[in-house]
Amino acid sequence: RQVSSAASDVYKRQLISGNEAAGLGAVYGGATFCSWYPITPSTSLAEGFEKYAKKYRVNETTGKNLYASVQAEDELAAVGMAIGANWNGARGFTATSGPGISLMSEFLGLAYFAEIPLVVFNVQRGGPSTGMPTRTQQSDVLACAYASHGDTKHVLLFPADPKDCFDFSAKAFDLSLI
């Protein structure tokens, strides 16, 4: 959606959520694969990727998609597919939230120690777990920083607004190669 500035129709602005901006950033970052399992509040990030990939990741001659987006049967399958895509040279990612990170931790260690580039979007909920909206905290930060068993230190990016979501998403795919 575009809206006009109150002062003039010359200035146009894009209204976009952080999740949709991250999905668009993933497309600009070169992502061609997304695997995800529906979990609030991250589902709209994968949907944003699909929306923009349909526009920007299509062969102009044949009309065939140059991307894949898979709704997995669970969080383990979602991260496993993303690891497999990256292992085979694609730029793939998954999107989840805190409980999904907990379930993905063993595979996150596999990617880390096998040095397989991987981007995981953790769209954090307001509380420490499901059903805890009155006690907010940032527990996902440590869960992500040291995800898996062993001595892991993952790169974490913390966007503050939709512009950061776009920029950090696009850059995350390059950072995953470090």
Question: Where are the regions a protein language model picked out?
Answer:
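Single conserved hydrophobic/aromatic residue that forms the stacking wall/gate
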Residues: 1-7, 11
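Active-site mouth loops of central-metabolism enzymes
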Residues: 12-16
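Active-site pocket-lining segments that scaffold enzyme catalytic pockets across diverse folds
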Residues: 19, 24-27
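Acidic, PIN/NYN-like endoribonuclease modules and their adjacent C-terminal/linker elements
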Residues: 37
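Thiamine diphosphate
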Residues: 40-144, 155-176
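Flexible glycine/proline-enriched surface loops and loop-helix/loop-strand junctions
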Residues: 150-153
